[in-house]
């Protein structure tokens, strides 16, 4: 264990953290919850790592970092990349005897009648045992799991579920029932952090060329951490640049800066982040602006089926919060099991992930959300503009905005002043739709970064 002093004159502010219970804060769909600590300091940023560092920075609190924390953040991002680029990783994670087809792994529990009673760690171990028999690179199962001296059953299982998510495009899983920071404490041994570096190298061995530089930069960061354990005072400037806040955008907006951001490969919209990394000149940055809410939650969601049920359950694992132990902030890993009570997106009546939908006029008639076509969510006959003058719509156009992953409903018609255009921007969530904004604008605005998926003309006016 090493203690790195960044500023011994920095006095801790008189802060009384507000703690909330993770078991009371999570989505109602969650039916099983396991955390290292279910009491988390109240969250303000989607990603717990960034939230904790920001909280420490703002309140002059020391933080405690484990190899597990780094590895889970890195592994969940790498797993996301594999899931989005599965064709590049088929040779590693597909069934070696049947690589072009999805293989179902079924685990039976005759002594249990519901998911809540099943020991999830046992379910995961049985899944991994089956994967060990099927995949070519089964050595990755152990190489990529949390096995540091700081690891515990929760962080180990979190990393193992992330591995299951990597193989998710080639395997399906089914459960069959009987029915400002003053100091940083680096937990673990130097061998643990060397082990972290070895795991990053393992990812480098199988990574595609698009992300090799990202992993190489992470290896450089890990080397400096290892040196810091041996010689805590050598890389103080490096640690001071781990995290800081800058003004960005307009007004008083701020955003995260520092090399901690290099643990992220994608933002929450699954857009690949650009990095500026110059270790020699100590330049560590993200290209462009990444606002607090742009950081993704450190979580993977691995679907599995139960018996003959049509809707999937999900194994969710990641980092869910942070707590305070001996005046140091520490992250909380965990895993949950959830079951959706709606169908989400489907294509040809088969469940699919929203990111894989090909929004186009050719495929539009085959895309549904919760069993309904997109235009069926709205039956618009008339719209009121901002001057409260009603007009008739003779043209309804629906766009999928590729930048914001939202649906734009455009209504064109006429009022006494001439042609008008009104819109509603919606998000599909929790089995329904939520209007995020509405107003009037020129149609050309919506064409940018959008794909037209539906157009209907009505020859009658109401």
Curated annotation (Swiss-Prot):
The record's section on InterPro entries has: DUF4419
**What organism does the UniProt record list as the source?**
Acanthamoeba polyphaga mimivirus
This chain belongs to the protein called Uncharacterized protein L662
- Mention any Pfam family matching this sequence: DUF4419
């Amino acid at each position: 264990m090493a203690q790195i002093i960044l500023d011994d004159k920095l006095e801790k502010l008189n802060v009384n953290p507000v703690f909330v219970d993770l078991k009371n804060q999570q989505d109602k769909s969650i039916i099983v919850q396991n955390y290292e600590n279910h009491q988390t300091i109240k969250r303000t940023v989607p990603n717990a790592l960034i939230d904790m560092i920001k909280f420490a920075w703002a309140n002059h609190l020391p933080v405690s970092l484990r190899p597990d924390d780094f590895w889970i953040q890195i592994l969940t991002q790498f797993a996301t990349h594999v899931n989005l680029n599965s064709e590049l990783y088929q040779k590693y994670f597909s069934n070696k005897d049947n690589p072009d087809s999805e293989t179902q792994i079924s685990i039976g529990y005759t002594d249990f009648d519901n998911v809540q009673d099943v020991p999830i760690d046992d379910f995961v171990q049985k899944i991994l045992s089956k994967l060990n028999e099927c995949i070519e690179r089964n050595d990755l199962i152990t190489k990529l799991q949390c096995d540091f001296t700081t690891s515990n059953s929760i962080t180990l299982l979190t990393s193992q579920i992330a591995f299951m998510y990597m193989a998710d495009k080639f395997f399906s899983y089914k459960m069959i029932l009987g029915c400002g920071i003053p100091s940083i404490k680096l937990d673990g041994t130097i061998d643990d952090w060397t082990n972290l570096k070895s795991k990053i190298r393992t990812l480098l061995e199988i990574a595609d060329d698009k992300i090799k530089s990202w992993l190489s930069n992470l290896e450089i960061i890990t080397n400096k951490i290892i040196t810091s354990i041996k010689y805590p005072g050598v890389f103080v400037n490096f640690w001071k640049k781990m995290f800081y806040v800058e003004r960005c955008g307009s007004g008083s907006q701020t955003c995260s800066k520092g090399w901690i951001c290099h643990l992220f490969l994608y933002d929450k919209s699954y857009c690949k982040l650009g990095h500026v990394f110059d270790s020699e000149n100590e330049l560590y940055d993200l290209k462009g602006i990444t606002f607090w809410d742009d950081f993704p939650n450190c979580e993977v969601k691995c679907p599995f089926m139960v018996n003959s049920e049509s809707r999937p359950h999900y194994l969710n694992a990641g980092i869910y919060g942070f707590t305070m132990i001996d005046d140091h902030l520490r992250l909380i890993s965990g895993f949950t099991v959830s079951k959706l009570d709606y169908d989400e997106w489907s294509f040809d009546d088969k469940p699919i992930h929203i990111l894989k939908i090909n929004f186009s006029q050719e495929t539009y008639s085959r895309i549904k959300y919760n069993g309904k076509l997109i235009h069926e969510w709205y039956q618009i006959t008339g719209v009121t503009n901002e001057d409260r003058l009603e007009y008739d719509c003779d043209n309804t156009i629906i766009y999928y905005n590729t930048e914001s992953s939202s649906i734009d409903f455009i209504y064109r018609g006429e009022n006494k002043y001439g042609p008008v255009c009104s819109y509603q921007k919606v998000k599909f969530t929790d089995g329904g739709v939520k209007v995020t904004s509405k107003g009037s604008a020129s149609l050309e605005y919506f064409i940018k970064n959008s794909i037209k998926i539906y157009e209907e003309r009505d020859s009658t006016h109401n």
